[in-house]
Swiss-Prot record:
EC number: 2.7.1.67
Listed Basic and acidic residues bias regions: 1-11
One Pfam family recorded for the sequence: PI3_PI4_kinase
UniProt cross-references to PROSITE patterns, sorted A to Z: PI3_4_KINASE_3 (PS50290)
Name of this protein: Phosphatidylinositol 4-kinase type 2-beta
Region annotation G-loop: where it falls in the sequence: 133-139
Stated family: Belongs to the PI3/PI4-kinase family. Type II PI4K subfamily.
Primary role: Contributes to the overall PI4-kinase activity of the cell. This contribution may be especially significant in plasma membrane, endosomal and Golgi compartments. The phosphorylation of phosphatidylinositol (PI) to PI4P is the first committed step in the generation of phosphatidylinositol 4,5-bisphosphate (PIP2), a precursor of the second messenger inositol 1,4,5-trisphosphate (InsP3).
Region (Catalytic loop): 308-316
EC primary class: transferase
UniProt keyword annotations, A-Z: ATP-binding, Cell membrane, Cytoplasm, Endoplasmic reticulum, Endosome, Golgi apparatus, Kinase, Lipid metabolism, Membrane, Nucleotide-binding, Transferase
């Protein structure tokens, strides 16, 4: 990539029933699938970080760490190996002197990702700072390794489009000039970093493989946008440590406060989808490669639909197309041995779904804008879902235990946010369950992506008697409701 970056149906089969919408809002109760203990397994989640006691002190303008080191670790966290602990040496380092990035992220369940974060921290400590990305309406940064190579994209929570430290003025003018359309009324404000990590979690659970690895981490850099107060306090503490070491060593932290945000691995060789889609119109793909693209496209559709991405244009998903041009082969001429022609591989095409920070709404868009999926107008959206995609997805999402497991994993991720509200989270999951119900029906009926997005919008809420456990029992019921209110500007 270039640097751009209920009436309980106890006697009926245990299936969610897809209802046709009536003129008014319709409500029905359905019983889920029978328990399947094999599906109740742990799933990958986000990176979690535990601060040492001395590092918990909060400076003005930044969020304090939310996970406490003291107290018992939940069985779920212990089972998944998600616990992150700061060592005693970390506490000693934090109690005085300069605090490096290494004290903030100790990732135990993904050594490869931990190594990448470690290299990013080393680069920052050696003066190779993250570079702010000029595109977009928020503060996001290309993170580099000590050699200056881009290895990831970091999006701090405090610099999100509606964050208080957003360094770009686009949203400020939006708020002043058009306050009635400011923000997205269907989204939880300032949770974009969790949405990014949540999209990767959903992608991995469904086996899609289109979202680059994304987790929640903490980083510190001079190039991040800090308030004047934070920078002044940092300078004052450093000065005190230099002039009066006895006093300076008593500070809990020397330097700028860490920022929490999403860290997504950088993908090489990808370009914006718009670029390749235009090129494919004039230079059609070989049949096998076209099928590859269609399969990858269907995975993008499923991801966006399940998480109800409200910001999917053709400029924020990427395509990588590896092929050997005919001209390049002709240039080799006689120097290219005949036996090697048989070893020429077919072109490979891959899709990367980036920019997933505006997803997981707590209600369907029903105010000013519909926030449509822009891929719905592509020719690929008019082709029915392939059998390969149906075989991959249907066995998973047809099992309500799998869906419950997915909701539990998202809960473990989202609850780490300082402003987490369980009631709002349950509304987010109700929308997601409705999307999954529609997707299940569409795959069974052999519908196309465009027909999928035209299906009635559904919310599947947990009934009051429903259990909160991981294994869904037959007595657990969900209420299916059709959302009939449409936004003022609607595309379908």
């Amino acid at each position: 990539m270039e640097p751009k970056q209920t009436a309980d149906a106890r006697d009926s089969p245990p299936l969610l029933v897809f209802l046709e919408p009536a003129a008014e809002e319709v409500t029905a109760h359905t019983a889920p699938l029978s328990p399947n203990p094999q599906s109740a397994r742990a799933a990958p989640g986000s990176a979690v970080r535990f601060f040492s006691d001395s590092a918990r002190e909060e400076e003005a303008g930044e969020d304090e760490p939310l996970l406490k080191k003291s107290g018992p670790v939940s069985p779920r966290a212990a089972r998944k190996g998600r616990t992150r602990l700061s060592s005693s040496s970390d506490r000693e380092n934090m109690s005085g002197g300069h605090v490096g990035n290494g004290e903030f992220n100790v990732i135990l369940d993904d050594l490869e990702f931990a190594d990448i974060i470690h290299r990013a921290e080393q680069a920052i400590e050696s003066g190779v700072f993250p570079e702010r990305i000029s595109q977009g309406s928020s503060g996001s940064y290309f993170v580099k390794d000590p050699k200056g190579k881009i290895i990831g994209v970091f999006k701090p929570k405090s610099e999100e489009p509606y964050g208080h430290l957003n360094p770009k003025w686009t949203k400020y003018f939006h708020k002043i000039c058009c306050p009635c359309c400011f923000g997205r009324g269907c989204l939880v404000p300032n949770q974009g970093y969790l949405s990014e990590a949540g999209a990767y979690l959903v992608d991995e659970k469904l086996g899609l493989g289109v979202v680059p690895k994304t987790k929640v981490v903490w980083l510190v850099s001079e190039t991040f946008n800090y308030s004047a107060i934070d920078r002044a306090k940092s300078r004052g503490k450093k000065y005190a440590l230099e002039k009066v070491p006895k006093v300076g060593r008593k500070f809990h932290r020397i330097g700028l406060p860490p920022k929490v945000g999403s860290f997504q691995l950088f993908v090489d060789g990808y370009k914006e989808a718009d670029y390749w889609l235009r090129k494919f119109e004039t230079d059609p793909l070989p049949e096998n490669t076209r099928k590859q693209l269609q399969c990858q496209f269907e995975k993008l559709v499923i991801l966006d639909y399940v998480i109800r991405n409200t910001d999917r244009g053709n400029d924020n998903w990427l395509i990588r197309y590896d092929s050997q041009d005919d001209d390049e082969l002709m240039e080799k001429g006689d120097d290219f041995p005949l036996k090697d022609w048989k070893e020429i591989k077919e072109p490979v095409i891959k899709i990367a779904a980036i920019d997933n920070g505006l997803a997981f709404p707590f209600k369907h868009p029903d105010e000013w804008r519909a926030y449509p999926f822009h891929w719905a107008w592509l020719p690929q959206a008019k082709v029915p879902f392939s059998q390969e995609t149906r075989d991959l997805i249907l066995p998973r999402i047809s099992d309500m235990n799998f869906v419950q497991d997915l909701c539990e994993d998202l809960y473990e991720l989202f609850k780490t946010d300082k402003g987490f509200d369980k009631a709002t989270f349950e509304k987010q999951m109700s929308v997601m369950r409705g999307q999954i119900l529609n997707l299940t029906q569409a795959l069974k009926d052999g519908k196309t992506p465009i027909q999928l997005v035209q299906m009635p919008r559904v919310v599947v809420e947990r009934s009051c008697s429903g259990s909160q456990g991981r294994i869904v029992q037959m007595s657990n019921a969900f209420t299916q409701t059709f959302h009939c209110r449409k936004p003022f500007f609607s595309s379908w």
